[in-house]
Amino acid sequence: MNRRKTIVFLGDGMADEPIPELGGKTPLQFARTPGMDQIAREGRSGTLLTLPAGYPTSSEVANMSVLGCDLASEYCGRGPLEAAGRGVALGPDDTAFRVNLVTTGEGILRDFSGGHVAPADAAELIAALNERLGDSRVRFYAGVSYRNILVLSGKDFSPGVRTDKPDDNHGEYVQDHLPVASAPEGETTAALLRELILKAPAVLADHPVNLRLRAEGKPEVNGIWPWSGGRVGALRKLSDKYGVNGAVISAVDVIVGLGRCLGMAVIKVPGATGYIDTNYEGKALAAIEALKTHDFVYLHLEAIDEVSHEQSLKLKIQAIEDFDSRIIVPVLQAVGPAVNCAVLPDHPVPIKMGRHTRTPVPVSARVAGVEPDGVTAFNEVDCLGGALGGMKADGLMRVLLA
C-alpha cells in the first residue's frame, strides 16, 4: 500500500461550461492557476463521475463519491452529516434535516442564502424559531450563516419525504416546492415540515435582526427551507478502507460531518467562512501542519460554489485564482514533491444555470513513481485527454491510496 502523504484540494463547484464572454473558455481555462497546472503537468488527469443518476445533485453526494464512499449502502441524506458537523448527537429515532434561512418575496424564493446572513444574526433567528416553534420533539440548531439544522425526534417521524434543494429553485414559488411524503410513513413528517415553513415567516418578520436589516437596506431573512432529511447511518472509516489516518479542513458542516463520520480529524481554521472572504492563508497553513501528523488531508473550499450559485463570473474567476495562489501554490511549495496530491471540483455549477449538474468533473493527480501523461493544464477540456480516463465510484481514492 502507498504510505506517502496525500492531500486533496477540493474546489466546490469549480467546474463550468464554455462562456462566450471568455471567448468560449471555461472559468478554469480562463483563470490563472499555476498550482493546479503544476499538479496536472507532474501527474495524470481524467474525469470523475461524482453525481450518479438516482442520487440528489448535492454536495454531500459528490464529496462522498470523491472520498470513495459506497453510495448504495452508505448514503443517508444530508441532514445527519450536517448534524455530525455541528456535533449534534442523533439517536436512532431522530430525523435530521438541513434547513436554510432564506429570503422570499411575494411567495417566491429570492435568495437561498438569506443574503449570506451573518452567523451571529442567524444564531439569533434560529433561537427565535426554537422559542416559538420548537418543543421536545422539534429542535433547530444554528450552523454557519444560512446553513442550519432541524432535528425531529420520535418514531412517528421519517426521512420518507421528498424535499427540493433550495439552490435549484431560485425564482420559484415556495408553495410549489413544499415537502410531500415519498412513502406512507412520511406523511406525518411532511405535514409538520409544511407547518413549520408556513409559520416561520410570522416568527421572523419583526425580529430585531430583520428590523435592522430592513433599516440597512439589506435582504431580510424571512423564511426557512428544510431539505434532505435522513437518519444516522454507518460509514466505513477511511482507516479501515485505505489504512490511512485522515484530516478534513472545511468551513461547512456537511463536509466536516462527513469527515467525522469517516473517522477523520476535524481541523478548524479561524476566519474560515465558507465564502470569498474566507481565511485562505489559514487553510493553507492548517494543511501544511496537518500533513505532519496525518497521512491524508482533505482541504475543501466552499467559496467557489457560493459565487457560482450567485452567477457572478467575476467572483468565480477571483475565487478560483485565490484558491490557487493562496492555498494550492503555498502548500505545494511547502511540502515539495514527496507528497501525493490531487485537485478537482466536487461537481460543476455552470454560471449560466447557477445550480449543480451531473457532468463528470476534471481531476489531476500527482502520485510518486507514476509517469506524467503529458497534460499540462488543469481544466475541463485538457483533462479529458488524460491517462486516468473516465473514473467512477472510488476511482480517485484508488489512484491516490491503492
Please give the residue ranges for each predicted region:
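Feature captures the catalytic ectodomains and active-site-proximal regions of enzymes
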Residues: M1-A402
